[in-house]
Amino acid sequence: MFSVGKKISFILPIKGVLQKLKDNAQKTVLLDATWYLPTDTKNGKKEYLESRLPGAQYFDIDEAKDHKNPLPHMLPPADEFASYVGKLGIDRNTNVIIYDRKGFFSSPRVFWTFKVFGHEHVFLFPNAFNAWKTEGLELETGEPRTPKPVVYEGAKLNKDLVASFDDIVKVIESPDAAGVHIVDARAHERFLGNVPESRPGLASGHIPTSINIPFTETTAAGITAPKPEEDLEKVFSSHGLTDKSVPIITSCGSGVTASVLFAALKECGFKDVRVYDESWSGYGKRANEDSSLLATGP
């Protein structure tokens, strides 16, 4: 759990990753969290099976999800999360280091998931593949290693990190009283409602009162890593986010790039940040049926 008012260093460079592996390899697990948008022809699991950081396990957000919910990769129940990560050899005290092949795209979603369920020792390793190769280190190929299953105890959903549709409605109905910023991580044209959504049955536009900070404004070119903290501060400040005590809810298409903003905001010391789990995949359907929920244009 994030400590209130305390800056958490959870983004690791290659040297930090290697040090953790050196200090406590038996209690450190690398997780490949590679995932691509449905419109992409690539497959994260297939790429993992072809090559990976040595010893890495694969975290599939389309497997570790709420299977009773038709929306994409919604958070799983706590007991199912515990069962899933236990099979990956992860217990409550494991150092979990998460990366994705793109660099800093889907790994923050898995980072946020671990935080939601109260895992303390979880880190992000941006630009992992390039950093690994630059150090002259080899990737692992062939059959992935099979971890020894363990029991993950004490998983409990932290509601302070998750926003629901009801939370969104409260902000829409009384933004000043709610005192919450809703930040949309989608591309600007989607936010404006100028282009159709790729998923069927979704309205085009945005949540009333929300502001748009495309997640790519917070990442380096190619979405390989987060921008330096100083640059992130400038991005958020330019959009009016200067008071780090004001609550923020991040949203996107299905909760993935909203988690990129979550990580960037936490890196800058924002204290109260939640991810709207269903994001536009759920909200857009509701807005299709109730136009009062929809805003378009700037």
From Swiss-Prot:
One of its GO terms (biological process) is mitochondrial tRNA wobble position uridine thiolation. Coiled coil: none annotated. It catalyses: 2-oxo-3-sulfanylpropanoate + [thioredoxin]-dithiol = [thioredoxin]-disulfide + hydrogen sulfide + pyruvate + H(+). The modification Phosphoserine is found at S164. The keyword Mitochondrion applies. The keyword Nuclease does not apply. It is found in: Mitochondrion. Its main location: mitochondrion. Substrate binds at R190. Residues 24-141, 176-292 form the Rhodanese domain. It comes from the Eukaryota. Its EC number is 2.8.1.2. GO terms for molecular function: 3-mercaptopyruvate sulfurtransferase activity; thiosulfate-cyanide sulfurtransferase activity. GO terms for cellular component: mitochondrion. The active site is at C252 (cysteine persulfide intermediate). Contains two rhodanese domains with different primary structures but with near identical secondary structure conformations suggesting a common evolutionary origin. Only the C-terminal rhodanese domain contains the catalytic cysteine residue. This is Probable 3-mercaptopyruvate sulfurtransferase. It comes from Schizosaccharomyces pombe (strain 972 / ATCC 24843).
